Amino acid sequence: MPIRQLPEILINQIAAGEVVERPASVVKELVENAIDAGATRVDIELEAAGVRLIRIRDNGHGMAAQELPLAVLRHATSKIASLDDLEAVATLGFRGEALPSIASVSRFTLMSRRATDEHGAVLQIEGGTLGEVIPHAHAPGTTVEVRELFYNVPARRKFLRAERTELGHIEEWARSLALAHPDLELRLSHNGKLSRRYKPGDWYSDVRLIEILGEDFAHQALRVDHSGAGLRLHGCIVQPHYSRLNADQQYLYVNGRPVRDRSVAHAVKQAYSDVLYQGRHPAYVLFLELDPARVDVNVHPAKHEVRFRDARLIHDFVYRTVQGTLAQTRAGTPPLAVGVGDVEGEGARPPGRHAVSFSGRRGGASHVLGSYSASTAPLMQGVPSVSVADAPAAYAALYAAPPTQVMDAVPQMQTGLPLAAGAGDVPLLGYAIAQLHGIYILAECADGLIVVDMHAAHERIGYERLKRAHDGIGLRTQPLLVPMTLMVAEREADVAECEAETLANLGFEVTRSGPGSLQVRSIPALLSQAEPEMLLRDVLSDLSEHGHTRRVAEARDTLLATMACHGAVRAHRRLSISEMNALLRDMEATERSGQCNHGRPTWARFSLAEIDRWFLRGR
């Protein structure tokens, strides 16, 4: 077959195969265009889950009549004009591919009007064939109608799923968008019935977070707001005991754009590593903000993925921020919850939707949840921007100020004797009153009853003390009497050669002895009884994939957790009131004491009002 130039309609239909996967893809592209046009309200009307009709109506800036034919041409856009614009793009869309791709596989109508125009205009396209632009009555803003999606591409249409499934994809995308843009009013109707309405608000008013993710999520949320090295991470993560069976409540936004990023997800999972029950997943809504020039958003047809210029710095920043947030939690301390309505006053209000910007453009989500540690100074101070060449300096800024050690500021209560104090001075976990079946400690607190699993609690206390002790002496190495030869892939050998200093800091002395072989001369002393060969392979795999590894630290922590478990007080051991109170005070002063080393909860609170309801008091 000879080489030939494809017709424009076929080119657009091929492009539609990348951009328009299903009705949810159409809704995504059109609503993002509305947001880029400054809309504060978007109405989405669907019939047959978008297969029969998708109508998107917004109150944005609108377009002039003469711009309508341009809007449906490939690579025609108002958002970029040069390579510099592309490298610093802050809008959700920028390629100019969505409208022509959608119009080529549907019966397409575009209506728009600017506020300064006397009337609007309408343009109809069927199967890629443009009609005439004619005057049309229309409110300021834009309306796009997409009818009979894939009517001229039967092979694509037969791959669509059931109506309920396709509608579910649209609703899930709408939830993700509503989280990123709390000041946007979003209405979703299906077959003439209003199914979702997200009212405009902000994160402090908690309405949207509860509406989308539920009260349990909102009341277990820990606020995150951390800046440094030209980066900012804010949003919320939930306490470990709210973990999920599936990773279905994990939302990440980069400069307001919803994305999936394996490196960031890996960093969050590592931060939860020793407080999460096996097989469970954390839940979070996180917003990462950085200079648009430091992230490439033009790497995926649907813009679901991005590429960071310094992925290792991002990974470390996210890990330390989330890990630091979790480390601030103490047994008895209520979460810094989103949704309890405890933030008032003008100074507590988040900035407006146009506040976050690195290049003069609007930067998507810009709300603030406040610092994860209201009582301590920020861990890091931000700097304006960092180039790849300045990465070492960025790392120095990132690690310049270690997290505040609250342990040093809280006195250890060893006597366990109740203090002569008023109700306002009752400790968070109260005072012990009894032991239940030799397993649980019962304590009276200011507003009810505390129940503590004494083995789980003592296990966490011992574990954290062991970690601090080993952190203080550093990681010691043990030379091997006979060097160990390790056969690896050439790529892994390259990583070992380039990361020799990193491996040395982890306790491994490794030299390359051939294209695919390594000589291991020393290993971490604490892990000498483990399987150093398998551990080193895992370390090389992490360094290759993420540029960062915590395998040695995790292996060390696993060993220390086992030691702490064996050294913890056993069930059915009788404790005196003083011993129980000492354990409660240690819990209040120990990081992550809300969970044992295996991720199980260590305590529970029953309020007096809850207990009253058990006995129908006050009715």
Swiss-Prot record:
Gene3D superfamilies xrefs: 3.30.230.10, Histidine kinase-like ATPase, C-terminal domain, MutL, C-terminal domain, dimerisation subdomain, MutL, C-terminal domain, regulatory subdomain
Gene Ontology CC annotation, any one: mismatch repair complex
Top-level taxonomic group: Bacteria
Alphabetical GO biological process terms: mismatch repair
InterPro entries: DNA_mismatch_repair_CS, DNA_mismatch_repair_MutL, DNA_mismatch_S5_2-like, HATPase_C_sf, MutL/Mlh/PMS, MutL/Mlh/Pms-like, MutL_C, MutL_C_dimsub
Assigned keywords, A-Z: DNA damage, DNA repair
GO MF annotation list: ATP binding; ATP hydrolysis activity; ATP-dependent DNA damage sensor activity; mismatched DNA binding
Record flagged with keyword Transferase: no
Role summary: This protein is involved in the repair of mismatches in DNA. It is required for dam-dependent methyl-directed DNA mismatch repair. May act as a 'molecular matchmaker', a protein that promotes the formation of a stable complex between two or more DNA-binding proteins in an ATP-dependent manner without itself being part of a final effector complex.
Family: Belongs to the DNA mismatch repair MutL/HexB family.
Protein name: DNA mismatch repair protein MutL
Gene: mutL
